[in-house]
């Protein structure tokens, strides 16, 4: 299970594309396809510049009306799912 201290990145075999206000990810090796809503898209955008989940949580708390506990739980669950699908990896 991830913690907020984790640092993640998008693997080289994963391509991303913006489609409207959503982001689509495709793992070219496994064929795994994943779509992110606008909040998930913002998470992915920040992941590429911040890397550390703690920094991403702090930034998103400034942008979205949500409790820290809820945001952390939601982002950790999303990151775990993306790790398991090969769409993220440890940095």
Q: What is the meaning of each model-derived region?
A:
Residues 32-91:
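Long, charge-rich, low-complexity alpha-helical segments
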Residues 1-41, 45, 91:
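Acidic, low-complexity/disordered tracts enriched in E/D and polar residues
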């Amino acid at each position: 299970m991830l913690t907020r201290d984790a640092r993640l990145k998008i693997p080289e075999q994963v391509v991303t594309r913006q489609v409207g206000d959503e982001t689509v990810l495709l793992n070219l090796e496994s064929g795994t396809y994943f779509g992110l809503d606008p909040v998930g898209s913002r998470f992915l955008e920040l992941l590429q510049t911040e890397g550390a989940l703690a920094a991403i949580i702090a930034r998103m708390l400034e942008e979205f009306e949500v409790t820290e506990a809820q945001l952390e739980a939601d982002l950790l669950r999303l990151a775990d799912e993306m790790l398991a699908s090969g769409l993220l990896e440890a940095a």
